[in-house]
Amino acid sequence: AFAPADSVATFKLQEYGMPKADIATYSPIPLVIGLFLPAFISSTVAADPISVVRLGIPLKLFTCFLSFLVVQATPAAYAYAAQGIGPSTSFLCGFVGTMILHEISGTLIFMSFMSFFNKVADPAIGGTYMTLLNTISNLGYKWPNSLALFVLPKITTPELDGYTIETMAGFIIGIV
């Protein structure tokens, strides 16, 4: 459900006119938030990790939808880039806000899983069981991104962008 926003959105932003320099300029903002966010949410997550996942997944779905809207607004925002007119402040605020929400929701889900793995891991065998659970979790999280990138050119037609199809399908699957 999250793969188009995680793996395809940045490529689509570039395809629709956003320069790499703009993406690189605003990317450190959520990175800094992501560095300090675990310190603030660790006490909440440790108490009941599953309830935090129930909060994080709808937030991430909402963020994926916002990411889709930002990608769709990019051609209009950069329509006059050749004349030296950049995107509006509201577009850039929406872009950065979406990146921040994406970072928050991803960190919530990641920390919830780590806290859950910590609760179910057997301390007698050390970190082996937790490492196994984390590896399985990472594989489960990464293969949809690879699949989204692989399928994208196959479902893209001149009439309809494959990113739109993937995003809507992922959003529906995420709701179900």
Name what the model sees in each region.
Residues 34-55, 75, 152-153:
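Helix-to-loop junctions at the C-terminal end of transmembrane segments
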Residues 59-88:
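C-terminal ends and interior cores of transmembrane alpha-helices
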Residues 77-116:
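Hydrophobic core of transmembrane alpha-helices in multi-pass small-molecule transporters
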Residues 1-6:
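Conserved extracellular-gate-facing transmembrane-helix segments in secondary transporters
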Residues 20-21, 93, 123-136:
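Loop-to-transmembrane helix entry/capping segments in MFS-fold secondary transporters
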Residues 9-34:
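Loop-to-transmembrane helix entry
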Residues 27-31, 133-149:
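Glycine-rich segments within core transmembrane alpha-helices of 12-TM secondary carriers
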Residues 49-52, 150-174:
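A membrane-interface helix-boundary motif in multi-pass transporters
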